[in-house]
């Protein structure tokens, strides 16, 4: 049996590359899954949601194999897999979804009802998401292959565009979903809170959807420069001033049509103090009456590192009366990746969006993953793509 290595969370602030079991066609509860496949991982990315766990801001246990952004080549298929074949190059949505339950049939694959005994929704390599082993590894098992996997039509073309296509597993559909949920359309003015990879992906998606002005706010100057590099207006929160005043300066009016929260529960206010509700409250302040707010930023039910007891259980101090008075619609939750990934794949393959350039992908080896985590945590304006087998280096 081949060997396997993966990125393992070992405690707050620590990840290591370790030898792990080679995957089998077995689910986390020990049941044989003939609907699954084994992938040789071609690309797997470090995500901001992984950082929440690594910072000790969740109940993730040491020993958890990280990674939910997985692209790979099929090397083994279960006996009931009919459509996906050995040798196919595929993108795996970060959601684990059965394709059979009510939610999956209604395209709400982010909250599949069967893949996680604890609650609706599953994901690879993530705490409380069903125990599915993560894909920041050389090899990984993907269940429900015929339903879940997106096959690339031309392997050679896909390898040439892999730094773009690897973003289909999470951040591009997530940013796009945030914008669609916020009602972004032709001519919209859009405020994106957060200039990390998801925020940058949301900004790129907003342009794809036809936004006239896309504004990105953050404290990180390097990430704001990255946003500006593909046409975004920016608000540097480290320089002070109210969001309202900044919008007035940029747009001539103190509000936007649509807003997207790409920050989540580790939001900070001026001075660096955590204030988990600050982004949501600011977005309600500046979104026009009858506007919509997309919230792909992660909010959790358990945060052991929160500053107060309420926030430790996901209870936030929201100015909800303002949102009600302005007839806002707020949309939250895991992105149903399968709703968008094929269309976004076609946009990439036909050069309608250059997401790798927008998020500034940086390819690293599996052994360099711990340093990638450290650099990302320091605010690097990059999207780290792990290349476990050197496949992307060979294709370059």
Give the positions of each predicted feature:
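C-terminal hydrophobic helical "lid"/dimerization subdomain
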Residues: 1-2, 10, 30, 34-35, ...
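Glycine-rich beta-strand-centered segment in the early N-terminal region that forms part
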Residues: 23-45, 54-105, 110, 132-133, ...
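Conserved acidic E/D residue at the C-terminus of a beta-strand in Rossmann-like folds
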Residues: 218
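Conserved S-adenosyl-L-methionine
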Residues: 208-213
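Glycine-rich cofactor phosphate-binding loops and adjacent beta1-alpha1 units
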Residues: 182-184, 225-327, 370, 393-396
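N-terminal Rossmann-fold NAD(P) dinucleotide-binding loop
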Residues: 199-200
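Short glycine-centered segments of the SAM/dcSAM-binding site in methyltransferase folds
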Residues: 89, 189, 292, 329
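NAD(P)H dinucleotide-binding glycine-rich loop of Rossmann-like/cofactor-binding domains
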Residues: 98-193
């Amino acid at each position: 049996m081949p060997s396997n290595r993966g990125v393992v969370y070992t405690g707050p602030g620590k990840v290591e590359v370790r030898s792990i079991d080679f995957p089998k066609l077995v689910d986390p509860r020990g049941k044989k899954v003939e609907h699954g496949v084994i992938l040789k991982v071609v690309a797997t990315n470090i995500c901001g949601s992984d950082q929440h766990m690594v910072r000790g801001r969740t109940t993730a246990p040491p020993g958890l194999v990280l990674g939910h952004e997985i692209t790979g080549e099929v090397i083994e298929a279960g006996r009931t897999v009919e459509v996906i074949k050995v040798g196919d190059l595929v993108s795996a949505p970060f959601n684990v979804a059965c394709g059979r339950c009510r939610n999956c049939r209604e395209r709400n694959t982010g909250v599949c009802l069967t893949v996680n005994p604890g609650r609706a929704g599953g994901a690879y390599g993530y705490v409380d998401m069903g125990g599915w082993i993560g894909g920041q590894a050389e090899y990984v098992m993907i269940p429900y292959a015929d339903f879940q996997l997106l096959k690339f039509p031309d392997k050679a073309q896909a390898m040439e565009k892999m730094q773009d296509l690897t973003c289909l597993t999470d951040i591009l559909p997530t940013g796009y979903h945030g914008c669609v949920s916020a009602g972004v359309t032709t001519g919209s003015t859009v405020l994106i809170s957060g200039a990390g990879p998801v925020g940058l992906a949301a900004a790129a998606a907003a342009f794809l959807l036809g936004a006239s002005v896309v504004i990105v706010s953050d404290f990180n100057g390097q990430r704001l420069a990255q946003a500006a590099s593909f046409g975004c207006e920016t608000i540097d929160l480290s320089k002070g001033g109210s969001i309202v005043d900044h919008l007035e300066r940029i747009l001539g009016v103190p509000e936007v049509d649509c807003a997207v929260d790409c920050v989540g529960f580790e939001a900070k206010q001026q001075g660096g103090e955590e204030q988990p509700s600050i982004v949501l409250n600011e977005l309600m302040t500046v979104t026009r009456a009858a506007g919509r707010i997309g919230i792909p930023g992660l909010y959790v039910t358990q945060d052991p590192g929160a500053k107060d007891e309420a926030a430790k259980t996901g209870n936030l101090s929201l100015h909800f009366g303002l949102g009600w008075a302005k007839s806002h619609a707020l949309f939250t939750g895991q992105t149903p990746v399968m709703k968008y990934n094929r269309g976004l794949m076609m946009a990439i393959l036909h050069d309608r969006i250059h997401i790798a350039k927008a998020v500034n992908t940086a390819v690293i080896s599996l052994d360099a993953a711990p340093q990638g985590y450290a650099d990302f945590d320091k605010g690097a304006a990059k999207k780290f793509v792990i290349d476990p087998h050197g496949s992307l280096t060979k294709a370059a």
